[in-house]
């Protein structure tokens, strides 16, 4: 329970940090107006908002690329695990198992692994009882 509370507190803290914006003074907005020849204060706020968005896009791009790399590596690991399990479970050669796994979609591979490890976990739990 305390892990849940700590996780909830961290999420709330990050949400507050993400929502907080630096204080904008009228002087800073006037400088932006002069630089961009803006007549309206709302246009200056809009330009500052666009400047903040570029930073967010850079961060989103970094985390998006990192996520894609992690996902690619886990997909490769799942393929290898599925082949090993098929070889051991069905007693077929590695090439035959690889051909079967290649014919399966990613979703089917995930389901196959979940079934295998789910049965394994259920057996271990029943042994403990």
From Swiss-Prot:
Transmembrane segments: none
Gene Ontology CC terms, in alphabetical order: extracellular region
Signal peptide: 1-20
Tissue and organ distribution: Expressed by the venom gland.
Name this polypeptide is given: M-zodatoxin-Lt8j
Gene, per the UniProt record: cit 1-9
Function: Insecticidal, cytolytic and antimicrobial peptide. Forms voltage-dependent, ion-permeable channels in membranes. At high concentration causes cell membrane lysis.
Localization per record: Secreted
Highest classification ranks of the organism: Eukaryota, Metazoa, Ecdysozoa, Arthropoda, Chelicerata
Propeptide span(s): 21-60
Highest taxon above the source species: Eukaryota
InterPro entries: Latarcin_precursor
GO biological process, one term: defense response to bacterium
Keywords annotated in UniProt: Antibiotic, Antimicrobial, Cytolysis, Hemolysis, Secreted, Signal, Toxin
Single GO MF annotation: toxin activity
Family named by the database record: Belongs to the cationic peptide 06 (cytoinsectotoxin) family.
């Amino acid at each position: 329970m305390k892990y849940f509370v700590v996780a909830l507190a961290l999420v709330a803290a990050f949400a507050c940090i993400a929502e907080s914006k630096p204080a904008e003074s009228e002087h800073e907005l006037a400088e932006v107006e002069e630089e961009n020849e803006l007549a309206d204060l709302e246009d200056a706020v809009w330009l500052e908002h666009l400047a903040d968005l570029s930073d967010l896009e850079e961060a989103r791009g970094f985390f998006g690329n990192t996520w894609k790399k992690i996902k690619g590596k886990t997909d490769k690991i799942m393929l290898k695990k599925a082949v090993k399990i098929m070889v051991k479970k069905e007693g077929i050669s590695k090439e035959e198992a690889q051909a079967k796994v290649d014919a399966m979609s990613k979703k089917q591979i995930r389901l196959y692994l979940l079934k295998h490890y789910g049965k394994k976990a259920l057996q271990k739990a029943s042994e403990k009882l």
